[in-house]
Amino acid sequence: MESATSLISEKQCECAHPNSDSAVQGSSLRWSIAAIESLLDLPFSDLIFQAQTVHRQYHDANAVQLSTLISVKTGGCSEDCAYCPQAARYHTGVENQAILSREEVVAAATQAKESGATRFCMGAAWRGPKQRDIEYMTEVISAVKALGMETCATLGILKPGQATQLKQAGLDYYNHNLDTAPEFYGEIITTREYQDRLDTLEEVRGANINVCCGGIVGLGESRMARAGLIAQLANLDPYPESVPINYLVQVEGTPLYGTPELDPFEFVRTIAAARITMPKAMVRLSAGRRQMPEAIQALCFLAGANSIFYGDKLLTTGNPDTEKDLALFEKLGLHAL
């Protein structure tokens, strides 16, 4: 069997039927890039019908989890991710901020819970945590966990043993996105290798932490590259329990500012492909919702998205306010998990 953290090629595997046992088990490579391209090429209504059918087999079709994301350390990152306003080398207006205190994080988590969120995510802008950062994070994770919330952290590249410390503190999920397909990755990031990301996912799995791993669409990638991203995710063994799909938020000062915007229906197609290929996962409608019409968000839910980030800010970019989200839920007959 291939390693769960080896890169796949287009001809390595063929598509399993989405309703078959082999499509659910994470025991072997299941989805080729060509097979996922075939999904993305389907007539829109056929693709959405297939995704909704799979979604209803494994999830409450009208339930959406509310997650809140906070930046515990903002700005000054040494990486060169072309989409990120927190990279120190870009002039985006994002100022470096001192790491939040434990009390500030707990206060934010408490407010999120009172607003209806059940999941609290903490992100930090650095290449990877030092030991003192891990010690800080274990304190805040334990404190947030004590509130009865599901916890997630996105802290960059992990060294051996760090994931175990986070697990012992009560961390439920670790987020480390692949961002895009390996073939397109070098166009977006040069300061870390694709394999670095896969190695961190291996550390997370080894510590028995749930994996939160997805990507960004609208980076200027081709449809084949979007299929390649979904193939990489779906063929992890097992595939991630949580799959955030982000629509690029263009920030002035980053290299990707001014990139032609992706057709939003292509974003919906990507959500549908994620749902079909990873039927048990939470598919998270993540960054970019503020620029989406309500009708497009509704189509994303129909395509199998069952989580949103809730609150007026995602790290450093805007997000729909909570009242708008609750009003949309009422229109669509959705309820919070």
Curated annotation (Swiss-Prot):
Residue ranges occupied by any Radical SAM core domain in the UniProt entry: 62-289
Highest rank taxon of the organism: Bacteria
Catalysis: reaction(s): (4R,5S)-dethiobiotin + (sulfur carrier)-SH + 2 reduced [2Fe-2S]-[ferredoxin] + 2 S-adenosyl-L-methionine = (sulfur carrier)-H + biotin + 2 5'-deoxyadenosine + 2 L-methionine + 2 oxidized [2Fe-2S]-[ferredoxin]
Co-factor note (free text): Binds 1 [4Fe-4S] cluster. The cluster is coordinated with 3 cysteines and an exchangeable S-adenosyl-L-methionine. Binds 1 [2Fe-2S] cluster. The cluster is coordinated with 3 cysteines and 1 arginine.
Gene Ontology MF: a single term: biotin synthase activity
Keywords: 2Fe-2S, 4Fe-4S, Biotin biosynthesis, Iron, Iron-sulfur, Metal-binding, S-adenosyl-L-methionine, Transferase
SMART domains linked to this entry: BATS, Elp3
Enzyme type, top EC level: transferase
Binding site for [2Fe-2S] cluster: C121, C152, C212, R284
Required cofactor names: [4Fe-4S] cluster; [2Fe-2S] cluster
Annotated positions binding [4Fe-4S] cluster: C77, C81, C84
PROSITE patterns on file: RADICAL_SAM
Pathway: Cofactor biosynthesis; biotin biosynthesis; biotin from 7,8-diaminononanoate: step 2/2
The protein's role, per its UniProt record: Catalyzes the conversion of dethiobiotin (DTB) to biotin by the insertion of a sulfur atom into dethiobiotin via a radical-based mechanism.
Family: Belongs to the radical SAM superfamily. Biotin synthase family.
Self-association state and partner proteins as the record states: Homodimer.
Full protein name: Biotin synthase
